[in-house]
A protein has these predicted regions:
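Beta-strand/loop nucleic-acid-binding surfaces
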Residues: 254-286
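Electropositive polyanion-binding surfaces
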Residues: 1-265, 290, 296-321
Length: 321
């Protein structure tokens, strides 16, 4: 069956070390006027995963086929992670009890995939996955095939959704030209060699703009929603720690807000960048990833798309071990 085939494809991807960032996403529920009714966690069903498995496999097959045809083509490439940020990720993970084998300088996808499996299902899973994701370079389009690091594959392209993304449509045109029409003439090759670099670069740039726009709308709708809940309390998890405060992600909705260090007036806190900790100088209270908190919505700034929380209760992740 299709499900059995999908399961085998996914198992094979895990075997070769593909990295699966299965992060929870928010779903914004709006009425006919665009007013936010609710924000809930989006659930990925079996059918969605099945389609994703087949799409990934199809993209690999097309990418490899045209690589060996040695014709101008557009690939979806993904370079190795940024080493400095990767070291910080491993330091933070180690401080929480998760260590990996092997040299960071010789990083391979399977090492990161194994690390993700170590804390799968744990309270810190989403936070550590997010930090790891931020170490990654953004995938982009290029005529030079260097493989796709996160997918642990040597060949990859995008062609499965030509009705909604230009690079996919462009790949379809090349498939039609090279395969269906059998046109690999010098004129055609020269035309693609001339045009593809700019098309790949502009496609990558416009994709980045679209992602930024989507994130901005997401933040805007979350702020609109939280305006209704000022001064109300929520359960959350410490999702990031910085030198200017701690970010809290609410459990039910995945909405994130900041507790600024100026609002943490029970002590004077110093920042441990290596382990991503805020440590109280007098009381030695420590804020770290995964800590459970109860927060109050202190302020919502629609113009700057910022949500401020105030911590009412704090339970350390370490205290539960």
């Amino acid at each position: 069956t299709a499900l059995e085939l999908s399961t085998k494809i996914r198992a094979n991807r895990e075997t070769i070390g593909a990295i699966d960032f299965d992060k929870p996403e928010s779903k914004v529920v709006v009425d006919e006027n665009g007013e936010v009714l609710d924000i809930v966690l989006r659930e990925r069903g079996i059918s969605e995963r099945l389609i994703e498995d087949f799409m990934l496999s199809a993209n690999e097959v097309i990418g490899e086929h045209f690589y060996w045809m040695q014709v101008p083509f557009i690939y979806r490439i993904h370079e190795e992670p940024k080493m400095e940020k990767l070291r910080q990720f491993f330091d933070i993970a180690a401080s929480l009890g998760y260590r990996t084998k092997g040299k960071i300088e010789e990083i391979e996808p399977y090492m990161l995939a194994n690390m993700l499996r170590k804390f799968k299902g744990e309270v810190v899973e989403t936070m550590l996955s997010t930090i790891l994701l931020r170490t990654m370079n953004q995938a982009r389009y290029s005529i030079n095939n260097i493989g796709h690091f996160a997918l642990a594959t040597k060949y990859y392209t995008h062609f499965t959704s030509p009705i909604r993304r230009y690079p996919y449509l462009l790949v379809h045109r090349m498939i039609r030209t090279y395969l269906f029409n059998g046109d690999v003439s010098d004129q055609t090759i020269d035309n693609f060699i001339t045009r593809l670099p700019d098309l790949a670069e502009s496609s990558s740039e416009y994709e980045k703009r679209a992602v930024d726009c989507e994130r901005e709308v997401d933040r805007m709708k979350k702020c609109e929603y939280m305006l209704k809940y000022q001064e109300q309390t929520f359960r959350g998890i410490v999702s990031s720690v910085t030198n200017f405060g701690v970010f809290i992600t609410l459990e039910r909705s995945n909405i994130e807000g900041l507790v600024h260090i100026k609002a943490m007036n029970d002590d004077y806190y110093t920042y441990d960048q290596k382990n991503m900790l805020l440590i109280g100088r007098r009381k030695k209270k420590v804020y770290r990833l995964g800590d459970e908190v109860i927060v109050k919505v202190a302020n919502v700034d629609l113009e700057n798309q910022e949500i401020d929380f105030k911590i009412l209760k704090h339970k350390s992740l370490i205290s539960k071990k």
